[in-house]
Amino acid sequence: MTANVTPFPFPPDRAAADPQAAAQPDPLGDLVGDPLGDPLAALAGGGVIALITGVEGPHYRSPGTFMAFPAQGGSVGQLSSGCIEADLAIHAAQVAHDSRTRRLRYGAGSPFIDLVLPCGGGLDVALTPVGPAPIARALAARAARQDFTLGIDLDSGAVVPGGPGFQLRLKPATRFMVWGAGVEAVRFAALASAAGYPAQLTTHDEATADAARAQGLSPLRDAAPAKDAAPLDADPWTAVTLFYHDHDREPPVLARALASPAFYVGAQGSLRSHRARVQALREMGVADADIARLRGPIGLIPSARDPQVLAVSVLAEILSEAER
C-alpha cells in the first residue's frame, strides 16, 4: 500500500519560527535518538509510530519498517541513514499533540525539496498515534513467539490487532538452536548471538561449554537423547544447526529436529558425511520427506574450513532462507 502525500504545514527549518508552533509544548520532550533500540518495546507506554508504507526505487528499508517516538520522549529505531529522522521528529510531535495521522513523502516526488534521499528513491511514511493496549498485545505475542499483525488505518489512525488497513506483520525473531562440540559450534553460536538473534548452544563437551561461557553464552548439557525422544521445541522461525566432528552423535538430534517445524535444519560436514547421515536417518525410520529438508553441506561458501568463515557462511545462508 502506497501512502498519499499530506505535507506538514511547517517545513522543518521554519517550524520554530512560527509563533503558534513555538507556543505549543513539545509532548515528546527531548528527541534523543536510539537507532539501534527496540521500537516496539519503546511504544509500551504509547506514543507515535512512524511506518514506511511505500518505497519507490532504491532504499535501505522496506515497507513495514517502523520507528517509535515514545510518549516519554526520544526516538527509537531508524527509517533512513539519518536523512529524515530529525524531520520525522517534528511531525511526530505534532501527531502526538493533535492525535491526527500524517502521511508524508520523502525523496522523489516530495514537496520537501531540502530533504534529499541520497539513494535517489522515494519513501512514503505514515505517522500515527498508538496507545499502550495494542502494543501490549503485540509484545505478548512476541514473548510467546507467535506471528502477529497490527492493522493500521492510514486514514483514521486506528491501530487494531488483526484489523483493516496497512498490515504490519510482526514475526518472531529468527532463533538458533546449535548442537555440537568444538570451536565451530562456539563460533557460530557466538556470532548469531552477537548479531542480536536468540541462540542456544547444546553440547556434551565440557571444554566446549567452557569456551561458550567465555563468549557470554549459557550452554546446555547434551543428554544424548534416544532416537524416539520428542521433537525439538523448535517453531517455524527456528534454525537448527549441528557442528559435530563425531558424526555418530548427529542422527538422534537430527531426527528430533526434522520432526519439528523448524524452517532450517543443517549439519556441518562434507558431502560424504551428509550422505552417511541421510542413510543413518533412513535406518532410524525417518521419512524421506523429512530427510529431504536436511541441509548439507551447509553454508554459502563451499568447503569453508576456517571456523569464523564457516560461521559467517552458515549464518548468511540461514538468514537468506529466513527472508523468503
Question: Each PLM stretch: what is its role?
Answer:
Residues 133, 225-229, 299-305:
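A short acidic, often aromatic-flanked loop/helix-cap motif at beta-alpha or helix-coil junctions
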Residues 202, 239, 244-245, 255-280:
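ADP-ribose/adenylate-binding Rossmann-like module
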Residues 2-221, 230-238, 252, 273, ...:
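Segments forming oxygen-rich coordination pockets for charged ligands
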Residues 263, 268-324:
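Adenosine-phosphate binding glycine-rich loop
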Residues 247-251:
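Beta-loop-alpha module in the N-terminal Rossmann-like domain of NAD(P)-dependent dehydrogenases
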Residues 77, 81, 242-243, 266, ...:
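Glycine- and other small-residue-rich loops at beta-strand/loop junctions that grip anionic moieties
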